[in-house]
Amino acid sequence: MMKPIRKGMNLLNFVAQYPDEASCRVKFKEYRDQQGVVCPHCGGTSHYWKQDKESYECKKCGKRQSLRANTVMHGSQLPFRYWFIAIHLLTSTKKSFSAAELQRQLGHNRYEPIWTLLHKLREVMGRRDELYSLSGVIELDEGFFSTETPDDEKKKPLKRGRGSQKKSKVLVMAESQPVEGQTTKSGKPRQVGHIKMIVINDLKSETISSLAENNITKESTVDSDNSTSYVKLKDIVKEHRSQVIPKDELGKVLPWVHIAISNAKRMLLDIYHDIKPEYLQNYLNEFCYKFNRRYFGENLFDRLMIASVTYKNQFR
């Protein structure tokens, strides 16, 4: 039986728990202390808290780091409450929202810091999902998402179809298990588990097999079409079941992959315009993170906060 999708923390509860900057700062320190503070200089894990400096001092080497250091907020001058509001909205809404909308809601003068804030959080989401591999029966296919033409391609003649400069290639994988004891006119219904979406530069078999090896357990079974891009999958997983799939049958043979692609495209089209190819992965990170944690409810806020305080800032 399908689990009920739980609702996240509502706005009234959020405002009650985090009414001001001070409450957000105190809670952020609680998250850091719970996860453990590590000295970036010597690796020490015991620290003094210097209230007057709002910083940690390593008991081993004496070096200090601020409350924000080595977290998603590293180097940010934005208020703690901005970050808490953004994390609340990202984890409590089914759809996404733009940086321009968040900027408007916060009443902040500059767009760029808010844009960076959201992309850092989306990168945190992606890093978290990288820790887990898919298992069982996996549907696998590629999707093509509309993005801006890269600068180095703008002067070249526009290609059509899958090779268009306005399309970014995405490898999509979904755990898909038949529901026991149930049948429909189209066959056995399938229940989805977790999904992954990874932006790729090409459809070479080496590229696909490498990503499959890093994201799917060896004991899994992979279902796909008979594209030559997938010829090496049989060497990566326990079983690779490929077949010729007519275009109008894709939704029946690989249902969850194409539901995920369709829903992700709809989310992007509804909110964003002219997505740069280099940032598409971050938007897909958000989509997959929410989908994979659709049963977490209010716990999703805590999960993203925990991931944020342990995040090693590598955003470019």
Question: Predicted regions span which residues?
Answer:
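Residue-level recognition of single "structural anchor" positions
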Residues: M1-R316
